[in-house]
Amino acid sequence: MSKEVLKPEHLSKVLQRNDPQQVTDRTFFIDGSNQSLETIPSEILALKELEELHLENNQIAEIPPDIQNLKNVRVLYLHKNNLQCLWPELASLSSLESLDLSSNPLLYSSLTVVSCLRTLRELRLYNTGLREVPTVICKSLHHLELFGLSENHLQSLPGEIVNQTKLREIYLKKNEFSVFPCDLCTLVSLEVIDLDHNKLKAIPEEIGNLVRLQKFYVASNHLSLLPESLSQCSKLSVLDLTHNLLHILPPTLDQLTELTEVGLSENRLEKVPRLLCRWTQLQLLYLRNTCLRGLRRSFKRLINLRFLDLSQNHIDHFPVQICALKNLEILALDDNKLPPTMSSLTKLKILGLTGNDFPSFPEEIFSLVSLEKLYIGQDQGCKISYVPENIKKLKNLKELYIENNLVEQLPASLGLMPNLEVLDCRHNLLKQLPDAICLAQDLKELLLEDNLLTHLPENLDHLVNLKVLTLKKNPIEDPPMEVCAQGKDAIWKYLKENRIRKQMAIKIQAWWRGTMVRKGYGSYEELLKARKKGKTSPKDKKGKKAAKGKPAKRK
């Protein structure tokens, strides 16, 4: 096997990142990720004291035999490479506790080597094309605490999985399970189960055996019912049931009093389950597109909520219960039919109101002094035609989205918003931008597609932090379209040169004025009036030239 594949510049990059003065035989950590490496550098394999080695996202196709020198390595990350085979020498890593081989085209047969790593606590095999889990791994590795198998083609787990008595986390997301792997219910140490994006139709009653379960992810499956025994998982803090076929929840689930995050979006609930209002420790609640028409009065008990998503429902009035949620930081009410009623939620940082029926800009939001992001684009719903000057009251606002409306002009006060970073005005009727926009020095993105702009403010290039400027579908004349098509840098250059030309013109005009006045031709104002009326200058009044061959007449 060649040891000369490594290019010198790659090694220098690795050493430079890890401080070459500190890279010695006593080095404990090396980060060689994202370096286009084709093999593991021999210089790294000589670091016998190395404990943690990151080589992810390279082009490594094989592991050199000298890997066996790294007797002390405890963490080895090799995900996102081109590994197919694992050589027996890998089994010599007697201290290895965490191994990541994800996103490699591994041959199934080569995984036998992994079963020899008896000290492993974490094994990640995401996206490796697995159709079944090697039985030998489940038989031999008795200390696994984390097993990552997401993004494969698994339909079941081997019965030997029951040997993983220390397993705390198992990740099976994006596989092909149509039946819940019941053997998991015997692993009483489990704290995290992720079965998102499978084809599960039911969860067994035995799930109640997992009394230590803290996080349970079963989003994007075909679940129509939940077992009542789930209530025995009393330590559950996260329950994600998003995008299933649920209409109701078992009333016994009100015993899950430690829940802090619940996902129920994309189900057909039609009304908020009564028991939900008893989960008073909830901080994040997702109820998007659940056919809700309102909230229960008891909803106001959820005083610890920080995030609430009620978007894409059938709510036609502002739920006053929300006003009791004083800790709310993010509120999504997009695509409902809300009037502009809003109450003071002093900690609210993100507010989504897209697709609602506002006859005008809802000025009630100006009391939300902590607001950092405001979404009021109206791809559907009643479109607004103006943004009030009082938008400046939102001193902490960083991102303002007003796309898909009928706004004809922007308030000059936008230039007085010291934290504004993103301004999305796409698909409106803007004819010009206020000059004051050039004062919004923190602006990083200015999105102006599909408006009626014919020119840009001459000082727009003063926005030194601007990274993104979009101007497509505008009848731009100044700068010319060919300049705009070249991007922001070309526009900035044009604006600067245009200013210089104007300054020169002003200087020349001032010089001409001074010259005319000094020569006694009258004041500048008189000269200008005479010129406009088409009269001759004072100089021409001193005498007229005679016709050719004739003396001029004297007066």
Residue spans for each PLM region:
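The feature captures the LRR N-terminal capping module
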Residues: M1-S413, N419-V422, D435, E458, ...
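Short amphipathic alpha-helical linker/capping segments at the junctions of internal repeats
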Residues: G522-T536
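Calmodulin-binding IQ motif helices
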Residues: I508-Q509
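Repeat-solenoid scaffold signature
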Residues: D442-K444, L448-L466
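Short, flexible/disordered secondary-structure transition segments
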Residues: H455, L460, E477, R518-S523
